[in-house]
Swiss-Prot record:
Present with 7500 molecules/cell in log phase SD medium. Functions in the late secretory pathway. Required for the generation of secretory vesicles as well as for actin polarization and polarized growth. This is Late secretory pathway protein AVL9. Keywords: Cytoplasm, Phosphoprotein. Residues 10-173 form the uDENN domain. Residues 195-360 form the cDENN domain. InterPro entries: ABL9/DENND6_dom (IPR018307), DENND11/AVL9_GEFs (IPR051731), Tripartite_DENN (IPR037516). Residues 590-665 have a biased composition (Acidic residues). Signal peptide: none annotated. Belongs to the AVL9 family. It comes from the Eukaryota. The modification Phosphoserine is found at S519, S524. It is found in: Cytoplasm.
Amino acid sequence: MDEHEEAVIFGICLVDFHHKRGPEIEYWYGLPEGTQSAELWPNLPFQALPDGSHSFEETFTYFTLLYDERRQRSPPNGATDLSDDSINDNTTLFAISCSRQIKSDELVTKDKDVTRSTVQKAIVVISRQPIFGQIKDKLSIVTNAFFLQHDFGDRKIIQSLYENLKSIYTPASLVRNAENRLYIGLCLRKILHDFKRNALVLLKAIMLEKKIIVYGNDVEALCNLQFGLISLIPDLMSNLQDSGSPQLFQDISKLNVVDSFKSSNRESVLRFLGFPLPIFEKGGLFSPYTPLQQMNDIRSERTLFFMIGSSNTLLAEQKEELCHIFVNTDNSTVDILDKTLNPVLQLSSHDKKWIESISGIVSDTWNENDDETPKNSQFEGSEDFIRWQFEDYLTGLLSSVKLSDYLDLHKENDQALKTIPEDMLNSNPVHLFNLNWVQSWKETQNFLIFNSRTDDRLFDLFPPKHIYNGADTLSLLQQRFLATFHNLKRSSSNSSSNKNGHQSEEDIKDQESIESKKSVSQISVNPGKNTDKPAANLWNSWKEYFNKPKNTANEDVTESTEDLKNRSKTSNAIQKAMMGLGLHYKPDAETDQQSEEVGNSEDNEDDDTDEDSEDDDDDGGDDDDSEDDDDDDDGEGDENGDDGEGDENGDDGEGDENGDKEDSQDFSNGFTDVTNINTDHDKENEQNFEGNAENFNEDETVADKDIEGGPESNKNSDSKTDIYENDRNVEDSSKTRNTVKKSNEEGGANDAAIGNCVQDEEKL
């Protein structure tokens, strides 16, 4: 008996589906001596031949069995009705079955009970450890060979299987690299490929000790999912002895705090970290495949939480009243039925990015021919890679929770807080795992056991962190918000200082830089002129003017500077009319002090030839520089500065209604060669800008030169009126007359005034 208790392989049996009695155990082999086989696991046949297994050529099923070591039998009333004196005698065993079917006509010897066209049987191997992956292939081969005999009376092959497995899997052999042996056949890549981020949701739900049902037609897939999720918690697969009944648990009062470990011993390190987390302790049940015959165990008041699997649709129809979370492996969905769990199981941003990166790697390396092996057999995306990633995630989680609890416990103890590094104090990364989930986890039984057997300063040796090292989106947004706030604050401060007549150092530097660039520009454009007088104010005034948008509602251009608003309406009206003819007007009263402005001409068709500066003046004379104030802007050129042509409102050479009257009254004042624009600012910086062709670049418009160089005083202007000779050819003169006539037709009210101007030109 002692020999069998130590044996890893507990026994093997053959299950038959009887056409009248249903599933039943047909044959046992290898049971410990004295075991009452007739009273062993009445539900085992239903677990070995699951619902829907007849739809598959071959079906594997994983399930748990409860066994009383002292009495050598299974509990008589199920897993939830153990007597108090037998609780400590019970343990959990693990079984894997392989079922197949054959046509009854193919059998060499047909039993008289065979009344249907097919015969279905299953071979079941029971062990003390969940070594399903290691024995699955052998079990499949033996089962197939057993059916190929076409004679179920010959059971020697089943006996050979037991002897072979017993000799291979001994307690000593499992001790060596025991953890990795249990992971064989559990395809984590398949889980992440199908469920992606929900794989992490399910793992965190298991740690919260919730009721979870896994449903699907493919029994092997739903069993693989459950064991795969459990295997993500380090060393848990080796410690499932209490998972078969909600009445089994370990006494935490006997646990001692693990305060040291040996770094060369992995098991020692895991014990120091608190692994494995005892998930299925008192009140918990783990049954990878659960037939309807075990519904009493599920509904029992002693069953507080569970993870079970089923392929029966009746159980799926009752999911609302049976579980908190329902998982469907057929379509890879996770349905959280208890809506109060939504905020708890919501993944944090770090959780999402990490699990999505892992599932993305799996998808990128997916191999259609082999679920367990990535493309090119690389490590990234492999089973070990995934398992280590989850181990690092859980290690960081446990350490972060320990740090958070320590800070809460010693928040008023400065001496204790000084022993913690400042960066660790400031980070406190527990919030990266979703604080709602952390708070719920602290209320579970497995956390209480973990907390009672681990050191309070676990974070000193294992850094508290989230495995995802990417930038936090929320932190980036906060940084951007703060930067924007500081910029707005500085802008507000600068505006306020400017209103008070003060300038910041940055503004002073910027202004000095602009003036220095302006001086260089003036020297390069006008090397022979005097550039000592600054024209910054005039530049600012004209810069605003050129940047002003067109006011289509009032059919004028809005001007912002007071200098432009104070100009004489009469002189401007006359100037516009004269410039339409290619002539320039100069009032008597302003002979000594005058400012010359020439507008920008963008439409000059004669730029290819070498024209003198007088031609440039003629072309640009009726541009933007001849604008009137808000009420008298109709005489200006369009915004593009076309030569002598107005915009769509007919502004070329025309004044408004008041301007036209003044045009007809003031022709006697004479003609001049420049356009007169008088502003208060111009009087302070009075300069004459009379043209010498060498002072201007032919590639620049006249308005640009005014902006950079500013007007200069005309010291040589002695005569009251000067008339430029019109060097344009006959075609240009004709063009000018046509322009004037067009303006007369559009304006209407200015016919008389413009007519007089034409006559004066002909006389000249």
